[in-house]
A protein has these predicted regions:
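Structured adenosyl-cofactor binding patch, chiefly the S-adenosyl-L-methionine
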Residues: 195-237
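Fold-independent oxyanion-binding glycine-rich loops
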Residues: 10-11, 22-23, 44-45, 85-86, ...
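RNA substrate-binding interface of SAM-dependent RNA methyltransferases
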Residues: 72-165
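Active-site/ligand-binding-proximal alpha/beta "capping" segment
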Residues: 159-200, 206-211
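Non-catalytic positions within long, well-ordered alpha-helices that form the structural scaffold/packing
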Residues: 29, 99-102, 202
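Structural motif
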Residues: 4-5, 38, 61-62, 78-81, ...
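N-terminal positively charged helical leader segments and presequences
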Residues: 1-70
Length: 237
């Protein structure tokens, strides 16, 4: 049977027993796990601990750890998705899909046309839960680090190496191939970037890239850009 995946704060050592409570224990009960069932423990660092259930109660599940190893690494290098802040439910969808598509980081950006955005107190914990659940579903051993919202200028300054692309409908066609290494994708609000923002990005060494489509919602553009980036990195020159 497929191994259930449970999230822990820190991956336990081989031969140890790990007691899991709270939401992950509830997840184990929802999966109807029983003593002897195989499980995979992940902590978001790219490693996995394989083991089996040795006890299961109403409040906790205990796992005996049999092996720990690094999960298969992404062949292309880390992808950083920076997206102009949108409504929280749409951010949750972006976070979920970014995790499934292997983004290493997700940063919310406050642009000129998203100045009214204010992150609610519960937004960061909610996005953290979303990416953890998405990683379990996609069987990934890591998930994006969440940051922001940061100012547009700060987002530009934060990326100094690798390929840096800012999406713009009037920009150059999205690259068919990209060199291996870090890639940053800057996705704007539906109203688009201002001329001043585009000029600032170009002056900072970013390249424009177009998805060759009509006007897209921010979440659609984010997923399309991630998908094209993975394909372009697979065809790296």
């Amino acid at each position: 049977m497929p191994r259930a995946r449970l999230v822990v704060e820190t991956l336990p050592a081989i031969g140890s027993r790990c007691r899991i409570e709270g939401e992950e224990a509830a997840h184990a009960r929802a999966r109807r796990l029983a003593v002897g069932d195989p499980v995979v423990l992940v902590d978001g660092t790219g490693r996995e601990a394989h083991g089996s259930v040795v006890s299961l109660t109403r409040v906790a599940v205990e796992v005996a750890v049999e092996s720990v190893h690094a999960a298969a690494a992404e062949a292309h290098g880390p992808i950083h998705l920076l997206v102009a802040a949108v409504r929280s439910e749409r951010l949750s969808w972006i976070a979920e899909k970014a995790t499934e598509l292997g983004a290493a980081r997700l940063t919310l950006v406050a642009s000129q046309r998203t100045q009214r955005f204010r992150a609610s107190e519960g937004l960061a914990p909610r996005l953290e839960r979303v990416v953890r659940e998405a990683a379990k579903q996609a069987e990934r051993a890591s998930w994006p680090a969440i940051a922001g919202p940061v100012a547009f200028a700060e987002a530009l300054r934060g990326e100094t190496a690798g390929t840096r692309l800012i999406l713009d409908p009037s920009g150059e066609p999205f690259p068919a191939a990209l060199p291996a290494g870090a890639t940053a994708l800057l996705v704007g609000p539906e109203g688009g970037w201002t001329d001043a923002e585009l000029q600032a990005a170009l002056s900072a060494g970013w390249l424009t890239a177009s998805l060759a489509a009509g006007k897209l919602r921010a979440e659609t553009a984010a997923v399309a850009a991630l998908t094209l980036t993975r394909a372009a990195l697979a065809r790296r020159p």
